[in-house]
Regions:
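A short beta-strand-loop-beta hairpin characteristic of the jelly-roll/cupin
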Residues: 69-96
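Short, flexible loop/turn elements at secondary-structure junctions
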Residues: 41-43, 54, 74-80, 105-107, ...
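A short hydrophobic beta-strand segment most commonly corresponding to one strand
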Residues: 70-75, 100-102, 116-132
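Non-heme Fe(II)/2-oxoglutarate
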Residues: 1-38
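Conserved short histidine dyad/triad with adjacent acidic residue
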Residues: 39-67
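Conserved metal-binding segment of the jelly-roll/cupin
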Residues: 93-109
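Extracellular structured ligand-interaction cores
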Residues: 34-36, 45-47, 69-73, 80, ...
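Short proline/glycine-enriched turn/loop segments at secondary-structure junctions
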Residues: 109-115
Length: 132
């Protein structure tokens, strides 16, 4: 995965999530003990190159293995021209705020914001048994 320290300025980590975000994740259907999450803030000109996450924090927090997790990406803002999220061979654009995308823990993925508006999303590492 990407270096946690290198991307700290662009994230709100699980241990610092506001109550409103925790409540929102609960509304999606995930109780606090089944996930680890962070808010991604991607400003214009920023990107997260192609990578696989190691889910290290989630594994440690929930005492589970890497293979036990799936990722859920929730877009918090509507898509703007110049923004893209990619997972394996698929590139996603034109999302609406609240749209969710689920992918396997081992999938390669990336994100780029070449537009003029900041992109906000929540990334959730959730135990597979809780995915409906």
């Amino acid at each position: 995965g990407l270096d946690r320290v290198a991307s700290t300025q662009n994230k709100v980590w699980d241990e610092n999530l506001p109550d409103e975000v925790i409540d929102f994740i609960k509304e999606i259907g995930f109780e606090r003990g089944c996930y680890s999450a962070n808010i991604n803030v991607q400003r214009p000109g920023q990107m997260a190159p192609l990578h696989r996450d190691n889910h290290g924090y989630a594994c440690k927090k929930l005492n589970k293995q890497f293979e036990d997790f799936e990722r859920v990406l929730v877009f918090l803002t509507d898509w703007e021209v110049g923004q893209v999220f990619g997972c394996e061979k698929e590139c996603i654009t034109d999302w609406k705020s609240g749209d969710c995308y689920t992918f396997d823990a081992q999938d390669q993925h990336f994100s780029a914001n070449t537009g003029i508006e900041t992109k906000y999303s929540i990334v959730i590492s959730v135990l597979k048994e809780y995915i409906k």
